[in-house]
Amino acid sequence: MRTTHVVILPYDPKWNEDFSAIRAELEAAMGELALRIEHVRSTSVEGMSSKPCIDVDVVIPDRTCLKATIERLASIGYVHEGNLRIEGREAFCYTGKPHLQLHHLYVCPADSEELRRHITFREFLR
């Protein structure tokens, strides 16, 4: 289902807490496969208005880890959607996570240009 409108809210400090809860669940499932888990886009920028959706990048060593990553994320309710025509990142959707804030989850190899773009954009906004 696609939304027909966009909601922008004033900055909410809870977004960082929400990210921490999402990160904890991902870290528990991913273990050593996740080099790091990044909070990206506008909800990660203190004081910035944003859509109330947390954007998360899970960084893996390289594409050879993708199959194991997909399996581990599937074990906690995420479904791999492919790259959605954007090279350098893999998208995941989920159902049944009412305990977590609405979020977008992407998996990126450490050398991914898309990851670099996400981090650069976040740092520019900060």
Where do the model's predicted regions map?
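Helical scaffold of the NTase/Pol beta-like nucleotidyltransferase catalytic core
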Residues: 1-38
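Short amphipathic alpha-helical segments
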Residues: 4-6, 52-56, 101-103, 121
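Active-site nucleotide-donor binding segment shared across nucleotidyl transfer reactions
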Residues: 26-67
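Conserved catalytic core of two-metal-ion nucleotidyltransferases
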Residues: 78-113
